[in-house]
Amino acid sequence: WGDRLAGFFASNAEEYYGCDPNPNTYRRYQEQISQYNKFLAKPKKVQIWNCGAEDLPYDKLPPIDCAFTSPPYFSTEEYNKGGELEENQSWFKFNEYDKWRDDFYLPVAENTMKVSKYMFVNIMDPKIHGVRYRSGDELVDKFKDKFLGQVGMRIMQRPQGKAVFNDEDGKFDKAKLDEHMNKMFIENVWCFGPESDLFKNSRVATLDDFF
C-alpha cells in the first residue's frame, strides 16, 4: 500500500489523484504525503479521497495524463475484511460477479477513460470454485477501440498458508514451499488510450523492417 504514491513522488510528475475506502490506509497516505513533501523544495499537489473508485467525484478531476489501477480481484482480494468500514469495500458491496462487473469494474473504467488520456489496468482472471471469470477479455471488449496492447508485470508470490505445502503425511514440506516461491509470476497490465505505438522501443527488429 502506498507504492504508487511513493512512485509518483520519485518521478517528475507534478499532480496525483487517488482514492481508498480504507480509513486506515487513507490516514497513512496523508502521513506519506507530509513526509515526502518535506524533502522537496516545491511540494507536490496530491489529493486522495477516502472512498472507493465507484464513488470518486470524476467531474471534479482535471484532465489526467495517465491512470493506473489494479482493482481488487473479484472474490479474491478482500481488503480490510473485519476492519473499520469494511462495508465500503468492493468485495462487500459487489458480492456477485455480474454485479461486480456491471456496477463496479466496467463503469469505473469507463469513468476513468473519460478523464484520462491513458489507462493501465493490472488485473488477472479470477478463478473461483473452478470457474474462470474473464475480467481481462471483458475489459478489452468494452474498450477495444482504445486497446493498445498489454505488458507483463513480474510480481512477488502471494502469501499462502503452510497447509498448502504439506506432504502426503500432512507435514510441512519446506522444499515444496521454496520451489513455489522461486517460480516467476507474471500478471497482465492492459493498456488503453489514443492510437500510438507504446512498445516500439522494446520490439525486436528483423530484416523485414528494411523492405
How does the language model describe each region?
Residues W1-F211:
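Class I S-adenosyl-L-methionine-dependent methyltransferase catalytic core
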